[in-house]
A protein has these predicted regions:
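Long, low-complexity serine/threonine/glycine- and acidic-rich segments characteristic of extracellular
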Residues: 350-369, 373-379
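Solvent-exposed, low-complexity, repeat-rich "mucin-like" stalks and linkers
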Residues: 78, 317-343
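Ser/Thr-glycine-rich phosphate-binding loops at phosphate-binding pockets of nucleotides
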Residues: 224, 228-229
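Surface-exposed loops/turns
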Residues: 74-75, 326, 368
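Cys-dependent protein tyrosine phosphatase-like superfamily
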Residues: 1-218, 231-322
Length: 386
């Protein structure tokens, strides 16, 4: 139960709740029952996000007819059909549609507590953080084989960002991810709460990982998935414009770590107070001030926003740096994603000539320098510096 809507109202009852459930997360999967005629040899349920039933998840319902489905995206339309095999003949039902309720996407991962998708939270401009990109959780050291299969399969985790110190990590996992040897393991110890805002213990290094599209999907965690993990989530959510009230609710969703129980009454309060004191009129502006303070560039911040909030173009990793002109020109390697074209490029507010070919954008800057902006056909933008 999440009830902390301001700094004077936090969910102190979660300690009793956690004790009551026996230190384990509770998940409510979607349950679908299939009523079959006769006695089919095999019953399968197919579930897809696509109306044409492409790329479905397939569940075996033989003998019981009931399927519990974990890890569905929230606020999302799904399509399903049943497939039967009887007397060697395969038949299938018509396609049905159902929609999941809106809200946080909490996922049951074997051996891992407090696992949830950071997507689905509403943000400024009527947008939402995209699901399936960033996950937060507690320690992954004890992940089960089933948990690994979910993380590498359906969720497709590419990067494991560990926010703990070396002493907190099981020795066998100090250089590789418990998920898989194929997952990029990055350990960046960070400070929780207010210290994070001033660059303590790797704040900038942790945030920079989210600027590279090749790192996604990313899972980040500390020990309990609360204090350090909650601080990093707070910054990312503030940056993309999630309402402060929803950020507080997300922080309180960790069932065994209410603010008052872990760091006293002032840890989270100091984070919020320090954040509010940053320069800027909006949460996004304040987050930009802090992210610049800890070493992020405008190009990196542009990428983070476009990755999390749009399907628009982003800079490729090799172009995420200050550009030095050669013969009066600078070039950027772009992943265009769903953007189709560039409509304008400006430098210090003035339009400049450009050319786009095979994802390489060449901009004529002459002897000029400063802040530039690339605008795409879908009205998205990227910021660069010369």
């Amino acid at each position: 139960k999440a009830e902390m809507y301001d700094l004077n109202d936090f969910a102190s009852n979660t300690v009793d709740y956690y004790s009551f459930i026996g230190s384990s997360d509770l998940h409510t999967p979607a349950r679908i029952r299939i009523n079959s005629v006769g006695n089919p040899e095999k019953i399968e349920l197919l579930v897809s996000e696509n109306k044409d039933m492409s790329d479905p998840r397939v569940f075996d319902a033989t003998g019981h007819g009931t399927v519990n489905i974990n890890a569905l995206k929230t606020g999302t339309a799904y399509y399903c059909m049943a497939r039967f095999t009887a007397d060697g003949e395969e038949k299938q039902t018509e396609t049905y549609e159902f929609r999941t309720l809106d809200g946080p996407r909490v996922i049951a991962v074997g051996g891992v507590g407090n696992f949830r998708d950071m997507g689905s939270w509403p943000a400024d401009g009527g947008k939402r953080i995209k699901q399936g990109l960033i996950y937060r959780c507690a320690s992954i050291d004890n992940v089960t084989d089933d948990g690994r299969q979910l993380l590498t399969g359906l969720l497709g985790i590419k990067t494991d960002l560990d926010l703990r110190t070396e002493a907190e990590v099981a020795e066998e996992y100090r250089t590789r991810s418990p998920i898989s040897a194929d997952v990029n393991y990055v350990r960046v110890p960070i400070a929780a709460y207010r210290s994070f805002l001033y660059g303590g213990d790797g704040s900038g290094k942790a945030l920079k990982l989210f600027a590279d599209l090749d790192n996604y999907p990313i899972v980040f965690h500390c020990a309990a998935g609360a204090d350090r993990t909650g601080t990093l989530a707070f910054m990312l959510e503030s940056f993309v414009g999630v309402d402060e009230r929803n950020i507080f609710i997300d922080y309180e969703l960790t069932p065994n770590r209410p603010r008052s129980y872990t760091v006293g009454d002032d840890g989270f309060e100091q984070l919020v107070t320090g954040f509010r004191a940053a320069q800027g009129n909006t949460s996004h502006d304040k987050a930009v001030t802090i992210m610049r303070r800890v070493g992020l560039t405008d190009m990196e911040m542009s990428n983070i926003y476009n990755i999390l909030m749009t399907d628009s173009a982003v800079f490729k990793s090799q172009s995420l740096s200050h550009q030095t002109p050669s013969d009066g020109k600078v070039s950027f390697e772009l992943n265009m994603r769903k953007s189709k074209s560039v409509t304008s490029v400006t430098l210090e507010g003035k339009k400049v000539a450009y050319g786009l070919k095979n994802g390489t954008l060449t901009v004529t800057v002459g002897n000029s320098a400063g802040r530039g902006e690339i605008t795409f056909d879908d009205l998205s933008t990227l910021t660069f510096k010369v």
